[in-house]
Structure formats: structure tokens, C-alpha cells
């Protein structure tokens, strides 16, 4: 971060931390101005974004003969005009001249008149164009995907206009490992669309399949990743590029009731969902459910034409690469990848959810978190709830305090899908759903029927991924910590925690649930009783130790504790997780 002096104005300080990036891609040119200030660099907040929907890839091919040709002069002129406009915008924001990067990829690199194009940009703006080599382009693309999530582990696939890139990636604690031999193949969405018009599609399918059989060997997947994939039912596939984002938007369009339709970054689907759609597009050569009257959100006419080609490509790839269990979609591109590549390890290691929620944290948020964690069995709670959702919940605990009472839980439910952290880069749909569910419970969870349906849809987002039993536990404990915070924030509503007002004590109960056994004895046959009565539940008793006479624990607070008992009892009903809330009053 820049050094401050007494003469610095706020505008000068902000401007010094801004950087401009121009991403000259195959299917469009993206302009952005981002902040690289250390306190929020991990989530790369943008102050300006724009895009020129100009395909440098397509303009290099004759529409009649498919012969390659130079980038037309009028297109170069149009690009230079857009560049000059962005230069003025950078001046308006105060972006230092040395903090603007112009980065070009495949479409520029392979252009017949690449030098003419680059010189024209320099002549009109004074900006030099960095043309990434093939390996650098893959590396930056991987960084873009890694920046889009908290952790990434699995295979990496980028489908651009002219080519595709395959690699593997592991990111954890700020370190990024990837293949030293990534493979690029000429099967981009635009390339395949042209070939499908002239080539035999069956032959093309087998060509891609064989090429990817070789490619998967060349990238050298580490044995530990192969072993883990065997245990877990397959690899996660992390994707980027316009062709695959188009597939993601199509799958969202087809998923009736899916609650996060407008954010593609962080969306995940099962292998079965993705594979079925790929096969349909390949075999039918059309998009299901699409018409002139019903266009797919964020899928342009040009992208829609390419989707059958993407379907053919993915159908072939899936027959060549190891088993995939889930497909993850990323919006991280050259902007995000180039910024992330420059971040120090300690900033890369930060959790995007905690960085996004930190500006809203009460002064003593650590005390709230400490008190919350005294109500949690640390050894059994899912890691995502304890390490990510609980701290973010404490950060956001009072952000809706000024809202009308009846609006608070509803606004909280939407906090990461339409609310104050919805625009944060780096959040999966699962994380967005969980923090909304937790924060809604923190405000009591009293929401109208339509919002109750939305809440259930958010739960389904969580249940779609991974092991179903573990996902159910994650949802359960997320609701639990939100309900506990409802009481904590009722006792301490001012963002300040006084010592010795109340605390929690957790004890484990691992015995067979007697009440469940009795219910089955009354209502079912003897055989069923035997099977069910031996089932053990994870049982805990949480005692709220509270001062009898403290003003902060008056009738209104005691009423919250009664509500807590009811809500946790309801949560525990029919669940493997069982928590009983007890109350112990003491005199000071």
C-alpha cells in the first residue's frame, strides 16, 4: 500500500491504489479499473467495468471461404477509439499512467497483422500491448479461476474462441500449484463451430476424444490427486472461458427454482447435469427451451450459436478424461488472473467471504465470535461453518440493525445474492447461500411464505454439492449458529460485549435417543424398533449460564432464550444432530 503523507488528499490516496486493465480477448475487449489497496485486494473490487462486444477471432476469417485474413482496418480503428475512451476514463478516476496494463491473448497473438494492430494501439494511446504466450495465458487463466474461489483443487479447462487449455490446479493457503506442461488444443468454440459446418461431426468427436486422451497424460496429474479422486468419486472440474460460461447460464436457465440466477461465478453442477446437457446439444444441435420470445439470460445470439459446438466438445472430452464429479464455473479472466498473480502470499491466503464482510464488523467482533464458539462442539461442527460462516456471521451481525423489524430477516437472507456483499468476487454459490441462511436466523428467521420458499431453495444449493449427509449437517449447524447469534445480539445489541453477563457450556450426549425409541415402540412394529433403537445420534446439551438480575438479561432477553429452545428443538426433530438447550441462572 502507498505511504501516506500529511499533504495527501483522500482522492490522491484512493487514486494511487487504482489500476486499469484492458483484456483484449477472442470474443470481446474488457476494460476495468480495480483497487489494489491491501485491505481488500483479495476480492479485487472494481470501480469501473466496460466491454466492447467485438470478436477479434471471428473478424479474422472470411465468412464465405473460412480463409484466415488480417484484422480489418476499420476494426483496428474501432478498437483504438475504445482504447482512447478508456484512457480518458482512467484520467477521470486518477489512475496513474504507469498503473495501466493492456494484455492481449490468442486472437492478437495469432493475427496475421499482429504488429500493425499493436502499433496502432500504441500510437493512439501510448500504451504498450503485452501479448501473452500460450503458457502464460494458461497460467493467468488459472490464477483467474483460483481468485474466484476460496480454495481450488482439480482439473482446469478453458474454452476460448479459438483454442482450449487443459491443466490441473491445487490452491491452498495462498499457494498455487499447476501443471508445468499445460496443453493447448485448437478446439475453441468458434473454431469448432466453423468445422462443424464442413466436417463430419462423428469424426470430429473422435478426433477430440483421442487428442484429450493424449493431453490428460501430458499434463501429469499428481498421484495424490488421482488417489483422492478415486476415494471421492471423481475430480472437480474448474472451468472458465465464454463457451463454458454460456453452458453455465443455459444450465441455470433450465434449473427452475434455482435461487441465484444472475451470478455465474461460483455456480456448480453435477457431472450428470452437465453431461446430459452436452449430449443433448451435440445430438439435437439446438438449445432446449430457447426461442425468439424466450432468450437465455447472458447468452448472446453469437454465443447461442456456439453452444452445440461446446456440447460436442464436452461430450468428447468427458469420454477421454478421468471421472468428473462436479463442474464449477468461474468468471475469473485476465483481469482477475493478472491482479491475483501479483498479490503477496498472505493476501492470496485470505478468505474472500471474510474480507467482503469485514468492513461491516462491530468493533468487538472477535468477542462475539468467541462467545458464539462457546456454544459449538468444536470437534464435530463442519469446518466451513466454524471457520468461514461463523466469523462472517459475526462481521455482518448488525448490518441490518437500522432496518424495520419485519424486513431484517428477509434482507439478511439476500445479503450475498442481492445485498451488500452480492458483488464480492471469490464467493461460491454455496457460501452465498450459507451466509444468507445464517444471517436470516440471526434476526429470528420470521419471514413470509415466499421468502421461506427462497430459503429452502438456498438450502438446496448447499445440498446439491458433495456428500448429502454432510451437506445436511452443514445446513443444520448454519441455522444453529444463526439462532445462537439471535440470543447473543439480543443481550449485547450495541456491538459491545461485557464480561460475565452470560456464556455457554457444551457437553456431549452419545447415548441412544430414548424419546425416539419410545415413539417407534408406540407407532411401529417390533422389528422396526430394533433397527431404529440402535441408531445413535450426535447429541449435545448446551447450557446457557445467565445472570438472574442483570439488566441486560431482562424479560425480552429471556423470551429470546425461550425462542432459542423452541427453534433448536424444532431443528433437532428428525435430524441426526441433536442439541438440547438448558438454562442456568446465577446470582452475582
Curated annotation (Swiss-Prot):
Coiled coil: none annotated. It comes from the Eukaryota. GO terms for cellular component: cytoplasm; euchromatin. GO terms for biological process: maintenance of DNA trinucleotide repeats; mitochondria-nucleus signaling pathway; positive regulation of transcription by RNA polymerase II; protein import into nucleus; protein localization to nucleus; regulation of transcription by RNA polymerase II. Gene3D superfamilies: 3.30.420.40, Exopolyphosphatase. Domain 2. Pfam families: Ppx-GppA, RTG2_C. InterPro entries: ATPase_NBD (IPR043129), GppA/Ppx_hydrolase (IPR050273), Ppx_GppA_N (IPR003695). GO terms for molecular function: phosphoprotein binding. Belongs to the GppA/Ppx family. Required for a novel path of interorganelle communication between mitochondria, peroxisomes and the nucleus, thereby maintaining a functional metabolic interaction between the tricarboxylic acid and glyoxylate cycles. In particular, required for the retrograde expression of the peroxisomal isoform of citrate synthase, CIT2. Present with 3260 molecules/cell in log phase SD medium. This is Retrograde regulation protein 2. It comes from Saccharomyces cerevisiae (strain ATCC 204508 / S288c) (Baker's yeast). The lineage of its organism: Eukaryota, Fungi, Dikarya, Ascomycota, Saccharomycotina.
Amino acid at each position: 500500500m502507498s505511504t501516506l503523507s500529511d499533504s495527501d488528499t483522500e482522492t490522491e490516496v484512493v487514486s494511487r491504489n487504482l489500476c486499469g486493465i484492458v483484456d483484449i480477448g477472442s470474443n470481446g475487449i474488457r476494460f476495468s479499473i480495480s483497487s489494489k489497496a491491501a485491505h481488500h485486494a483479495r476480492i479485487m473490487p472494481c470501480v469501473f467495468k466496460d466491454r466492447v462486444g467485438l470478436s477479434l477471432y471471428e473478424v479474422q476469417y472470411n465468412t464465405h471461404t473460412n480463409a484466415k485474413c488480417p484484422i480489418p482496418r476499420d476494426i483496428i480503428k474501432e478498437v483504438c477509439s475504445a482504447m482512447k475512451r478508456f484512457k480518458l476514463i482512467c484520467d477521470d478516476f486518477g489512475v496513474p499512467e504507469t498503473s495501466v496494463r493492456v494484455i492481449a491473448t490468442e486472437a492478437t497473438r495469432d493475427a496475421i497483422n499482429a504488429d500493425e494492430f499493436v502499433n496502432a494501439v500504441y500510437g493512439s494511446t501510448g500504451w504498450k500491448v503485452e501479448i501473452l504466450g500460450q503458457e502464460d495465458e494458461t497460467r493467468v487463466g488459472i490464477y483467474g479461476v483460483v481468485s474466484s474461489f476460496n480454495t481450488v483443487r482439480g482439473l482446469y479447462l478453458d474454452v476460448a474462441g479459438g483454442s482450449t487449455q487443459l491443466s490441473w490446479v491445487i490452491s491452498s493457503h495462498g499457494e498455487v500449484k499447476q501443471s508445468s506442461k499445460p496443453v493447448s488444443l485448437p478446439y475453441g468454440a468458434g473454431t469448432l463451430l466453423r468445422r462443424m459446418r464442413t466436417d463430419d461431426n462423428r469424426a470430429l468427436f473422435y478426433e477430440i476424444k483421442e487428442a484429450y486422451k493424449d493431453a490428460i497424460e501430458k499434463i501429469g496429474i499428481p498421484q495424490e490427486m488421482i488417489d483422492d479422486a478415486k476415494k471421492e468419486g471423481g475430480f472437480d472440474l474448474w472451468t472458465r472461458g465464454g463457451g463454458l460460461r454460456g453452458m453455465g447460464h443455459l444450465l441455470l436457465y433450465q434449473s427452475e427454482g434455482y435461487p441465484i440466477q444472475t451470478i455465474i461465478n461460483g455456480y456448480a453442477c453435477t457431472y450428470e447435469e452437465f453431461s446430459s446437457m452436452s449430449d443433448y446439444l451435440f445430438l439435437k444441435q439446438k438449445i432446449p427451451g430457447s426461442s425468439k420470445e424466450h432468450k437465455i439470460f447472458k447468452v448472446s445470439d453469437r454465443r447461442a450459436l456456439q453452444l452445440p459446438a461446446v456440447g460436442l466438445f464436452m461430450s468428447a472430452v468427458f469420454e477421454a478424461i478421468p471421472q468428473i464429479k462436479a463442474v464449477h464455473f468461474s468468471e475469473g479472466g485476465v483481469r482477475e488472473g493478472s491482479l491475483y498473480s501479483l498479490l503477496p502470499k498472505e493476501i492470496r491466503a485470505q478468505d474472500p467471504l471474510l474480507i467482503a464482510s469485514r468492513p461491516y464488523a462491530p468493533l468487538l467482533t472477535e468477542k462475539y465470535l468467541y462467545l458464539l464458539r462457546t456454544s459449538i462442539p468444536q470437534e464435530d461442527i463442519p469446518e466451513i461453518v466454524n471457520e468461514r460462516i461463523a466469523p462472517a456471521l459475526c462481521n455482518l451481525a448488525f448490518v441490518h440493525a437500522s432496518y424495520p423489524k419485519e424486513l431484517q430477516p428477509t434482507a439478511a437472507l439476500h445479503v450475498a445474492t442481492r445485498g451488500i456483499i452480492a458483488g464480492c468476487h471469490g464467493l461460491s454459490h454455496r457460501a452465498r447461500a450459507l451466509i444468507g441462511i445464517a444471517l436470516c436466523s440471526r434476526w429470528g428467521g420470521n419471514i413470509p411464505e415466499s421468502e421461506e420458499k427462497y430459503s429452502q431453495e438456498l438450502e438446496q444449493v448447499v445440498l446439491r454439492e458433495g456428500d448429502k449427509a454432510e451437506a445436511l449437517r452443514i445446513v443444520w449447524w448454519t441455522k444453529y449458529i444463526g439462532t445462537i447469534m439471535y440470543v447473543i445480539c439480543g443481550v449485547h445489541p450495541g456491538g459491545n460485549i461485557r464480561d460475565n453477563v452470560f456464556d455457554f457450556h457444551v457437553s456431549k450426549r452419545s447415548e441412544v435417543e430414548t424419546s425416539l425409541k419410545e415413539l417407534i415402540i408406540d407407532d411401529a412394529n417390533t422389528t422396526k424398533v430394533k433397527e431404529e433403537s440402535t441408531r445413535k445420534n450426535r447429541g449435545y446439551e448446551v447450557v446457557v449460564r445467565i445472570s438472574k438480575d442483570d439488566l441486560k438479561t431482562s424479560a425480552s432477553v429471556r423470551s429470546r432464550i425461550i425462542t432459542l429452545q423452541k427453534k433448536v428443538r424444532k431443528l433437532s426433530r428428525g435430524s441426526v444432530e441433536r442439541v438440547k438447550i438448558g438454562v442456568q441462572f446465577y446470582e452475582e
